[in-house]
């Protein structure tokens, strides 16, 4: 499923190509690209749920609340999915104002919906990028996250 999300993001969303509204046509294209139908439906459902997070009457993620820094206590299930490196990265993103508590919760929500046994920091970075892309007014945070994702390490590697 995550491979399909990456494919869609890189080929349609991130490249600013016009996204087809016809889900059947998009599904056919993904099948031709070699993806399995059940995984395609899971990925499309994941994207629909991401879009639904903006509907404040359903999930009040985008309702403005207090902006003070809050320590996030993770559930056992979240700790099993998000290793210490991923959780530390989320905290880092909050500290540099790429994420706020609202977008952090959106990221965690989307991570927990990914149907994959393995999830790593690189996957986390892509989920953050997808979430920020879909939140109005987060263009600067998206650009900053894009820089973090694609920047090459400087200096010699030891």
Swiss-Prot record:
InterPro entries on file: Smg
NCBIfam families on file: PRK03430.1 (NF002897)
Family that this chain belongs to: Belongs to the Smg family.
Protein name: Protein Smg homolog
Organism: Pseudoalteromonas atlantica (strain T6c / ATCC BAA-1087)
Lineage, highest ranks first: Bacteria, Pseudomonadati, Pseudomonadota, Gammaproteobacteria, Alteromonadales
